[in-house]
């Protein structure tokens, strides 16, 4: 979310792997391998259709130890989280939603981790991107608000880190409510706050969603500016 250069992230992961291999801590080594596969997926040039189907295969996960299966819960949270994020990046929103729901089964094991932000943020957006004002039911609203309310609370405590994410999810909510002018304002707010905070991936996503919405509203010039 910070927008660090992927080459630098990969170098940090490789250093972490070199250290962890000396300690024989299998779960942490697996998590680092998951992160490495995710970064490599983002770095790989695309030819043809971009899909996350093979980004994080099931064989990345070792069999859980019989004597302490609960020890793998945090690792499983990260696995399904990163797999869901990879699907989201490719626009495979239904697959992203399914994987993020599985991550939610293990979210209890990662209290205080910043990755909970990614879980709630992408869970809300993976669902909202599949919906239209006509299909936005009360059940879907509750599901999105389950994630949005968490981020809104964090944004009140630490707006510098969370307010841009709150604005982007809120833009999606009011888009689904048919309040187009407010949605445009919130997309713009998300663009501005993510730029000011240096959150480059969120800024790019905010521009993309704002551009798609502007085009759907009949504003091609504004849409082109975002893209």
What name fits each language-model region?
Residues 2-227:
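Helix-coil-helix junctions within alpha-helical repeat/solenoid scaffolds
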């Amino acid at each position: 979310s910070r927008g660090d250069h992927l080459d630098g992230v990969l170098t940090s992961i490789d250093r972490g792997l070199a250290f962890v291999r000396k300690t024989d801590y299998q779960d942490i080594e697996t998590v680092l391998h998951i992160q490495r596969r995710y970064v490599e997926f983002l770095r790989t040039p695309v030819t043809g259709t971009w899909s996350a189907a093979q980004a994080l295969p099931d064989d990345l996960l070792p069999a859980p130890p019989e004597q302490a299966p609960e020890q793998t819960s945090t690792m499983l949270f990260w696995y399904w989280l990163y797999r869901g994020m990879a699907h989201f990046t490719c626009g495979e929103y239904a697959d992203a939603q399914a994987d993020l729901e599985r991550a939610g089964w293990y979210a209890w094991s990662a209290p205080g981790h910043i990755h909970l932000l990614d879980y709630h943020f992408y869970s809300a957006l993976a669902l909202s991107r599949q919906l239209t004002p006509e299909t936005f039911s009360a059940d879907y609203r509750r599901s999105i608000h389950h994630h949005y309310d968490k981020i809104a609370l964090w944004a009140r405590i630490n707006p510098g880190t969370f307010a841009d994410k709150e604005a982007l999810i809120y833009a999606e909510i009011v888009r689904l409510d048919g309040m187009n002018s407010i949605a445009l304002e919130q997309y713009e707010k998300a663009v501005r706050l993510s730029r000011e905070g240096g959150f480059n991936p969120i800024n790019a996503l905010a521009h993309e969603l704002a551009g798609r919405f502007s085009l759907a509203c009949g504003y091609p010039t504004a849409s082109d500016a975002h893209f």
